[in-house]
Amino acid sequence: MKYTPLYEEHVKLGAKMVDFAGFNMPIQYTSIKDEVLAVRKNVGMFDVSHMGEVIVEGKDSTKFVDFLITNDFKNLKPGEIVYTAMCNENGGFVDDLLAYKISEEKAMLVINASNIEKDFSWMKKISESFDVTLENKSDEYVLIAVQGPNAQKTLQKITNVDLEQIGYYTFTEGNVLDIKAIISRTGYTGEDGFEIYTTDKDGIIKIWKKLLNLNVIPAGLGARDCLRLEASLLLYGNDMDETITPLEVGIKWAVKFEKDFMGKEALKRQLEEGTSRRLKGFKIIDKGIARHGYKVFKDGKEIGYVTSGTFSPTLNQAIGMALIEKGYKSGEIIEIEIRNKLVKAEIVKMPFYRGSVKSKKKG
């Protein structure tokens, strides 16, 4: 079992700890509902040090990352970030990730905790035909996410960086307190917010404690999962895996067919032929919460399965996403098998909720 440097802080706060991707992580401190609403209405923070970081350096750094991922990396300026899929030869997700362009010859790839080893060996394999070096820095970097409509106002009190200048999906290097960090305007909640990366493991504890003093609410992985689902953000292992493609889960915008990338031929073929299934949002009409793997029916016929489901504290409603046969539209009624009982649900447009997240770049 791995522990983040903030483990003892979580225990002091009375967090309920669980094993997540080999890390002992806080699932909740007070209640998932309170933590979700704190992030939606004010500001909360998450220890997300379990995330993986791979540093790519070398002459072909930009060329390599651009081929590795489906989205455009080549045309990013240093200081910009892109959300993307990383696909196998069949167009299925190896992972989804954030690619940070530090310079033309250096990048940071932020990957899911459950996929660190798999992703790194996949990247190594692809990198053999490029002039690059790859380093798995996942154990060195620690990370706090500060999220919510008041994230900027709060974080500004402890950093020398003008946060107003950091546009959505951009980053800069600077100090938080006196700790050297990468600060990016990114998150996984649907709210405005920042992620603070540092290799200073004592420093991250100082930052955490200072934010607590500023009345930032600590939030666990339970709230994080609720928030991301309300914002219709995908979770690897639930909403996508190696057998599911970006086109099936509605992120065609993150696939750039005008360039070359791993999995392009398979995805191009799928684009031409059309997908046989699509990820759709639903809200439960009857009582019950749908969970990953539950079967979905229409008029007695099985049409797919639930990928993610939860009770949304923000909407006071059970919601979820399901991968179902194509052709079903918003407003249609489907049924989900919950504990051997068919429960009615309505297909709805996503996202379920739009928060304070900035979609326009500043400046």
From Swiss-Prot:
One of its GO terms (molecular function) is transaminase activity. It is an enzyme of class 2 (transferase). Pfam families: GCV_T (PF01571), GCV_T_C (PF08669). InterPro entries: GCS_T, GCS_T_bac, GCST_C, GCV_T_N, GcvT/YgfZ/DmdA, GcvT/YgfZ_C, TrmE/GcvT_dom1. GO terms for biological process: glycine decarboxylation via glycine cleavage system. It comes from the Bacteria. Keywords: Aminotransferase, Transferase. GO terms for cellular component: cytosol; glycine cleavage complex. Its EC number is 2.1.2.10. It catalyses: N(6)-[(R)-S(8)-aminomethyldihydrolipoyl]-L-lysyl-[protein] + (6S)-5,6,7,8-tetrahydrofolate = N(6)-[(R)-dihydrolipoyl]-L-lysyl-[protein] + (6R)-5,10-methylene-5,6,7,8-tetrahydrofolate + NH4(+). SUPFAM superfamilies: Aminomethyltransferase beta-barrel domain, Folate-binding domain. Belongs to the GcvT family. The glycine cleavage system catalyzes the degradation of glycine. The glycine cleavage system is composed of four proteins: P, T, L and H. This is Aminomethyltransferase.
